[in-house]
Every structure is written in structure tokens, then in C-alpha cells.
Amino acid sequence: MPTTTRMRDVCLQKRQCLLAFVLLGSLHTACSKISAEEHHAAQRPITVRDTIETTEFADRWYFLGGTPQYPVAIFSPDRKRFLIRLKQGSVERNVVEYRLLLYNSDQAFASPQGEVLMRMSSTSNREAIQQVRWLNNDTITFLGENPRELPQVYEINIDSKQLTRLTDHSTAVVSYDISRDGKQLIFEAAPRKRRVSGTEEALRDGIVIDSQILNELLDDGGERDDPIIDRELFVQDKNKEEKRIHSSDFLTEYLPLSLSPDGRFAVLSVYVSAIPDAWANYEDEVLRPYIVQKRKPGTLSNVVQYMLVDVGQGTMRPLLDAPIRWGDEEIAWPSAGDSVIVTGTFLPLDTEEKEDGARKHGFTVEVEIPYSKVHKITGDRVSISRWNAQKQEITLASKHATGGTTARTYAKRDGRWMEIPFSAKESTDARIEISLEEDKNAPPQIFVTDRINGRRSLLLDLNPQLRQFAIGIVETIRWKATDGHEVEGGIYFPPGYERGKRYPLVIQTHGYEPQRFWLNGPWNSAFAAQPLAAQGIMVLQVGDSVVEGEDRRYVNTPAEGPRRMSAFEGAIDELDRRGLIDRDRVGLIGFSRTAFHVAFALTHSHYKFRAAVLADGFDGGYMGQLLWRLPDGEGVNGGQPVGPGLKSWFEKSPAFQIDKVSAPVRLEYYGPLHFLAGWEWFSLSSILNKPIHFVWLPRGTHLLVKPCERMTSQQGSVDWFRRWLLDTEENRDDH
């Protein structure tokens, strides 16, 4: 399994929201919805290509399925102007095009079109325009690239449109921050290409294998542009003189990097290489297996920690002696550089904090620099919404709010942080508010609202062309899994749904969020919900247990596979009971972690599945465990794959049960050497003469970005299920 497995799943922060299950009921929200009349008048079914070429809000964490890293509108310090970043795929050119739109705040209602300040296109897996920051009221900085260019940090003057490149690094710059005066930069960059097996020394003397990862030994020498955990850290002064900050830990652009306003310090989070033995006393049920995992010294772990960089000294050390809860890393500076606020960190074990659960969950804290004195703010799971420097108040938004007030404000009084009454009107300095609004049936639109008089207007309809397509209605449903727990998900009805007709079903995995408009599903690898529905296939997007956090207790245990399998089985029973599906024509898509869930169901369930897709994921297999030795394999299979534990592997691992699989399986793996993760399933299926189709995208990243690779994957899923689920004359001849 590629070493970015944990990083790939970090964005799975699910929210539960019960909505009535209405077949084709009336749908009313503040957003403009696709009505039944528009469905009937649609010109044609939507295709995978249509979904690739939609316009999207271009935020990395929004793309990952989580809370956006940046607000929809990035306001200038004086609030007089704001920027919106958008992206759109082009299948014909195989690029993703980015636009940076500039608006004047006082003209947002009168002239909502905006000015295109910058256009850039990417043929890589990176964003062409990202990490946009206002340096002052007239200047912004950003990370940008065009085809056949390395990404670098740029500065552009809003009025003169003069573009200046601030970095000239020899490799791709992947993350950065800049001081308030623009004189100090810190950035992460890809390392120079290092080959292990192809060097003259290796060919002459051989290689001693000890702590290398498999990917290093078998690397084909090709350039990589997917997010990997090998980045190097540099600081650069106003004279463009670079200095590297060395670290024995592992850096990636998927973790935050923040420079203090005065440029003296920086805070970032890293994957640590040396985990203190004492950290085994932390009790987080998901994180702990990676803390106690046996690893060779100096190798990558799946444990993250905040680090403090002294820019002047060129040194790095831990900010706190504690790990971070996955996916909760955010940083804010309440002063020029004397202290920093971070979210999601556990408290050091020697802290005086005696609160129940202090070892079980993360906290938001203020840390004084350089002494690392900790001031606790809250133990809730939150994201940083706003820092009010004038009042010294911070507003934090709950990550799992199910209703009511979702934000709380804290102020420091007499050296302690205390919650104070939250006022929505005082939570921002802006007269106008820019918001992205969407839900399961409402395509994203951007609205402008006057916070004083309540006036509200549509600023930008991202995809008015969607009204031309027949798009299936999505409804929320709950059901009982066969083991008794209750699950929530979303049903995609085929356009023109006929009551009483039983449809084939494809079960998509990896979560359901009713507040998001998903044409394909959570991500763009393998999933293709609306294009499948357009072919007359009902799609169920499976979410989590309705009891918040309950599923976490089963992760990396022998109960994980059976629990997820029972959710699939219960869904089939419920939809069959409602007369919606033909239970003899059911397919499954597993991606990333849920490839294991689907593989387990294919090999252990008594329910019969007609077809399946396993895409770029952990499958709980024996070969993968020998290659990458992750604790996940030992966790879900009940022990080590040798000695006494081998018996449990024979019973639980899908790899030893492939002879029981009756469904044709399509395998997809992305990136250099990642095909090895699917080789066991492919080889054993081939030996058993079972229908198997294996696709490898050599330069694909885990969450596919390039339009042609998305076509191969997502259209491949549509074609696969059309072939095996639809009862057509062509398919009957093919079978």
C-alpha cells in the first residue's frame, strides 16, 4: 500500500443529518433546485465528461470532502475587494483550468460578473492557482503554474496587473507562507529526483536493504507530481537567498504550514519519524495502533505532530510533546509571533490538565513561544472561523454540528480562555457576506448578502448548463444493517423514475453528506453516481452509522469488515422491501479504505453481487501486508500474518477467500508501482479463471485530477456496470 494511505483518508469527517425519505416530493431551499419539470424537459442524460467539465469552487479541502481551507471569498484587508477561485476540467485538452475572479465589494450587487484577474492551467495533479493571500490592499501572492512549468510563488499587483515571480526554486514549490511585510518566505518543495536502484554505485556494489520503502527500491525514475511525503523546507529572505531547514521527519503539502506575521517563527505539522514510547498512553482508538506500530528507526509513521521553526536560527523542534488528531490541524497567530493557536493537538502527558478524556481527544490551545506554555481553549472538535486581533477573540466552528449554533467565541481574560456570548453579526468585519450554497439536489451557487439590511442576491451560478441534463433526484434514507446498527445514506433515482419498477443497484461507499451536491460521489476516483443513474441504474451512496463516532470503534479491528458488510446487506434488504431494486443485479464500488469493505463483502457475504470495482485501496490482503507492513492489515485480520495469527488471516483476509467470489471485478490502481497493491487479487483471479479487468494509471494520484484519467476511471465504472447489470441484448451476447 502506498505510504500516503492515512493522508488519503484524513478528509473523511462525516456529518449526520436526518431528512425525510420522499420519493419525488416537493423540494424547497434557499438555493435554486433542479425541479421535476426541468428533469422532464432535459435534453439528454448527463455523462462522465459533463461532470468533469463543470465549474467548481477551487479549494483543496473542499475537493477532499471536508471544510474549505479558505473562505469562498478572500477579502482584502480593508474589505473593499475580494477574490473567488474557480476551476474547470477540459477533456479535449486534458487540463484543469483555473480562474481567479476579482470583485469590488461595493459593486457586488450591481455587477456580479467579476473581473478575471488571472488564468492558469494545470496538466499535472497540482492546482494551477492555489494558496491565494492578500499581502496588502493592492497586492496578492499565490502559488501558480502553467503546463510544462514548475509551480512557484508569485505576486501580482491588482491595479497594474504586474506579475512578479518571488521564488525561482529548482523543483516544484508545493506550499508556502509569507510575512506581513512580504520580506520573509517559507516554503516546501519537492526534492530533487533520487534514484536508488539505478545509480552507478548501486549497479556496481549492490544495495543494503534495511529501512527503505518498496517504492524507493522499485522507482521507475519518472517525475512525480502527486502529493507525497518527502518535501523539503526552505526559508527565503527579501534578497531571494534560500536556506534549507533540515528535518528528520516527513513533510507534505497536505499538512498546514504557517509563518508568523513578523516572520520570526513558523509552525507546521509533520509525520514524525521517532514516536516517544510514552505516547502509547494516549487512548484515541484510531490513532493508537499507529503510535505503537513497530517500525524501523527513521521511517515514516502515520502520526502527526506540530513543529516550531525558528526562522533566524534555521532550526526546527516540536511545538508540543504530543500528537495531533487526524484531520484537525489548523493554525492561527493571535500576535505578531509571541504565541500561536493550534487545533486538534493532544495535551502533553505531563500537563496539569486532569479533565476526563484528556488522553482520548485533541484540544484547541494557545502556545506561548518560545517556552511552549499551553493555554487550553476547548476540547471540542472545531475549525478556526475567525481571529479578531483588535478584541483578542477567536471564533471556532464545530466540525460535527447537527443543528442550532455551530460557532462559539472565546476571549482571553486574566490569562485564561473563556467562552463568551457568540454574535453572528460580530463574527465578521465585512458588510457583505459571500456564501457557497448547495445541498444534495441543489447545484452550488455563490450568493452575496448584505449583513446590515438583509438584502440577498445570486452572485454566481457556477453551472447553469446543468439545467440541460436529466439529473436524478437524491433522497436521504436510513436503514438497519444486518447486525442491527442504523446507517444513513443517499439514494440517486434514475431520471424518469417509474414507480413499481425494480432497478439494478450500484452501492457507492466512503460516506454521504446531504449538504453537498455530488454529481459523482465523495471524490472523482471510480465513483460516477449521476452518470450511472442516467443509464437506468439506481445508486446508493452509503454513509456512516447514525450514532456519531460509533464507526471509529471498529476501525482496524476484526469487526471492521463484518460491520461494513452488514451495512451493504441491510441496504439491499431495505431497498428490496421498498420495491425499488432488483436484488439479483447489485454492484459495489470500493475506493481507498472501502476497497477492503467491498473486498470483504465479496468474499464473506452470503448475498450475491453481480459486479464490483476495487479502486486504489487497501484490501486487507496478504501480499500487501508483506510489501508495506501497515498495522491496518494486522488489525482487520486479527494478528500477524505468520505463526498463530495466520489462522485468523485464513478466515478473515479477502486474499484467502477469492475462490468464493462470483462477481466480475474491475481493479484500478494509480501512480508509480501502485499496481502492486492489486496484483494479488488480479493474479489469484486469473489463476481461478474468474472475470477480472485490471487498469493501471501510471501517473494518476489517489484522488484523480487529470480529465483523461478521470474518464478512464469513472467512465470505466459506468461501462463496467452497464455491461454486467443491464439486461440488454448486447450484454446477453457478451455474457
What are these regions (language model features)?
Residues 70-73, 81, 86, 266-270, ...:
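Non-catalytic accessory segments flanking enzyme active sites
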Residues 96-108, 190-242, 271-309, 350-365, ...:
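Predominantly five- to eight-bladed beta-propeller fold
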Residues 31, 35-68, 103-130, 156-174, ...:
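Multi-bladed beta-propeller domains
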Residues 516-518, 611, 616-663:
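Mobile cap/lid helix-loop segments that gate and shape the active-site cleft of serine hydrolases
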Residues 73-81, 131-139, 176-184, 256-266, ...:
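Blade-terminus and WD-like Trp-Asp/Gly-His loop motifs, strongest in beta-propeller folds
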Residues 689-735:
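C-terminal catalytic histidine-bearing segment of alpha/beta-hydrolase fold enzymes
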Residues 461-578, 582-584, 591:
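Cap/lid segment of the alpha/beta-hydrolase catalytic domain
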Residues 573-624:
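Primarily recognizes the serine-hydrolase "nucleophile elbow" in alpha/beta-hydrolase
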